[in-house]
Amino acid sequence: GGTGGTGGTGGNGGAGGSGGANFNGGTGGTGGAGGDGQNGTTGVASEGGAGGQGGDGGDGGEGGGAGFGSGVAGAAGAGGNGGKGGDGGTGGTGGTNFAGGQGGAGGRGGAGGNGANGVGDNAAGGDGGNGGAGGLGGGGGTGGTNGNGGLGGGGGNGGAGGAGGTPTGSGTEGTGGDGGDAGAGGNGGSATGVGNGGNGGDGGNGGDGGNGAPGGFGGGAGAGGLGGSGAGGGTDGDDGNGGSPGTDGS
């Protein structure tokens, strides 16, 4: 089967407006979420297509500058969340005495966007976006008469979290944004079949957490995906591994 298309990239957040005298600047816009990957197509008596990769989240917009007098700068925009990876296609049905096709692997989740840097006195950096979840593995194809079921496809890996924005300013430094959490890995596909069931696919690995900006904290690690179940006597797939935590800012 054919491979699913790649998800679209999230849009960048808009810049916050400048504050007037004694007023705060406007908050930067949040980056748009990445588009979902397209599903893989179903294979015909063959292996299912792999899911497409989720789109990356857009970076956050810059915060507005400080107003005249004692105005305070606006907060920087957060990064957009990564898109979910596409699901793998189902394996094709086997002919007589032949096994079904293997399911396609799930697509990787998109990475979270980076938070924007703070601008001006006491301007906080934006938070990093969360990584997208990995796509689900496609189910194994049905075995033909006397044929075994196909293997389930592996789950996609979670996307990495975005980094928090760096605080900047000529006066007191603002606080850095937190790193985004990584997306969870996708589940392995279940095996099916008229004869003996095929083995379930392995779960995808969780993505790594995003790194914090100076002063910020690293994002949490994504959870590993669940292994697919082996129906009809097949072996269950292995669970995916969790991602590594993000690094704290200094």
Model-derived features with residue positions:
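Collagen triple-helix signature
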Residues: 1-249
